[in-house]
Amino acid sequence: KTSSEDDVLNDDTDADDSASLAVTAIQPSGGSSSNVSSGSSYNSSGTSVTGTYGTLVIGADGSYTYTADQSAADDLDAGDTATDVFTYTLSDGTATDTATLTITVTGINDAPDAIDDTDSVNEDATVTKTGSQNDVLNDDTDADDSASLTVTQIKKDGGSNSAVSSSSTYNSNFTSVTGTYGTL
């Protein structure tokens, strides 16, 4: 957050002088504490610490920015949440106190990872692949849910996409694409 209404100091107070409050240290959950440079803001000499799901950059003025690390959060299904918790030290120049900043990371529907497939057939024969161990989805994955993968389009090199019916199987109502050397 970059405005004074939304930084970590917004709801922190000091009975002596709230104007002199500053963040002096930051610590990710389970990590080491790092000093925050006096007079810094998140975008000018701010201190960067890595949490479980992303990186927080925080300044002494309480401003911060958090950047989620998609690879760390890939295991979250769409709509699932996890939290990154950071403990910051607040100082008025004489005494200190600590508080936490909790960032909620929400999973998104990650794109599946389709792996190229190859096969071979004699010129006068047919090759048929069925079942989970032999079809084109066998080596494809989805961080969210590999069990729900389906083929939705197919095309030959240089051709256009052909939609695949959701009720298609290899022996009924299937979509065929004619290539240079045969029909798929």
Describe each model-derived feature in a short phrase.
Residues 1-49, 113-174:
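Extracellular ectodomain surface segments
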Residues 14, 84, 92, 110, ...:
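Acidic active-site catalytic centers that drive phospho-/nucleotidyl reactions
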Residues 37-107, 165-184:
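Acidic, turn/loop-rich segments in luminal/extracellular domains of secretory-pathway
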Residues 99, 111-114:
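Long alpha-helical scaffolds
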